[in-house]
Amino acid sequence: MDNDLLWIRKIITSCDNFSEDIDLVQVTAGPFGPIIDRIRERLSFLGEPRRSPKAHNFTLYYRFESEFPPMRPLHLKVETNTREHFIIGTQVKVPFSVNSKWFTESCEINTYSLEELLGTKLRALYQRRKGRDLYDLFIAMTLHPELDKNLLIRCYRKYMEISVEKPPERQEYISNLEDKMANAEFLGDTIALLPPDAQYNPVNAYNLILNELISVI
């Protein structure tokens, strides 16, 4: 599947927020059936998933129990974007490893450049009311000051253009985010996702993203 799928999100930005999702993108045009069969084969130890095919994505939902007491139900969502068959920046490989008493292995994972990942995240920040998008952008910008912001904005514009008929102007984006910053649900979105000792202030994140990115849209 190396040539067909790219991974997105937290494994690249080193964000420490918890997620029960695996997010993939099918970057080669063609039938998705063989790819989903391969994913199911690799995850067969989780049991048979519930499938949810849609026009532009295909999602597998797995439900299983934890392996140590107290036993509790867990779930995993594997969602693949089957629409955006292109890459703006450079495809990169990053190291990924698992080291636990159950399983130890390492590999390289295909993904987008960090700028392209964050371009899609900047789109998500406008389109949905989830404070985790602001958090992810803030952490990535803080950890990687060397980012090519021009490339990030170029990626944002491309992804926004294929998502909406009329991309927002700068002031529209600012007004959109100001409304969200006054929304308790948006501000509280990261509470259950971050470790208790996480030092995060959404107002600081808002100011950074506004000044560094949104101001140049």
Regions found by a protein language model. Name each.
Residues 1-11:
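Short gly/ser-rich loop at a beta-strand->alpha-helix junction or flexible surface loop bordering the NTP-binding
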Residues 12-16, 22, 27-217:
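Structured mid-to-C-terminal alpha-helical surface segments
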